Amino acid sequence: MDFTLMLPLICVFGADILFFTTIKSNKLDFKGKDQYRFIIPGIVILFIGSLFAGKNFTFENILITIGLIIFALLGNTCGVGKKGITTGSWFTAWSKVDDIYVENQGDKCILFYSNKNIKKRLIFKKEEENELKKYIENIIKDYNIKK
C-alpha cells in the first residue's frame, strides 16, 4: 500500500474517530435534522457508484468505502444538548453562539442560530416545539445569548 492510498484512509478514519468522540462527549437532549443532511450520504453514494462503474475493487478502496459509510452515518447527527449544538458532527459551544431562536414553519419547528462566521438552522419535529422553546429560553438566560 503506497502513501497516496494511506493518506485518504488516515483522513477518513481520523474523521470517523473525531465525529464519534464529538457525538459521545455531547449528549443531545433534542435530535434534529440539518438542512444539508443529504450531502455526505450523496458523496458516499457517488464514490461507491464510481467503484462499481470502474470495477476497481481493491482492498484499499473497500477500506475507504467502509470508512465513508461510517462517516455518512455519524456525519448527520444533529441536535441540541447541554454543552452546545451539534450540526453534522460539527460542535458549537453555547458560549460561541451569538443569536438563537425557535420558529414554527408549517409542520416543523426550526431552530436558527448564528455566530461570527455562520448562520445555520436545524429542523425538529413539530411535537417538540414547546419543549425546545423552553429549553432554548433557559440556555439564553444561562449563557446571555441574544434572542
Regions from the PLM with identified roles:
Residues 82-83, 97:
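Alpha-helical transmembrane segments and their immediate juxtamembrane interface regions
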Residues 91-106:
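Phosphoinositide-dependent membrane-docking surfaces
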